Amino acid sequence: MKNSKDILNNAIEEVSEKELMEVAGGKRGSGWIATITDDCPNSVFVCC
């Protein structure tokens, strides 16, 4: 069985430059991106 750190590391998704620009307002996008951060591990969705 994997430990929680391995599970978290596997759940983290890399964000492409295009996705980053969309959520940062650089281009039109949905404004939502699914992420898990070290600062707020219970936060699944971040809206910018």
From Swiss-Prot:
- Keyword Ribonucleoprotein in record: no
Q: Name one Pfam family in it.
A: L_biotic_typeA
Alphabetized InterPro entries for the sequence = Lantibiotic_typ-A_Lactobact
Entry superkingdom: Bacteria
User: Which Gene Ontology terms describe the biological processes this protein takes part in?
Assistant: defense response to bacterium; killing of cells of another organism
Q: Which sites are covalently linked via Lanthionine (Ser-Cys)?
A: 43-48
Family note: Belongs to the type A lantibiotic family.
Output this protein's name: Lantibiotic salivaricin-A
State which gene encodes it: salA
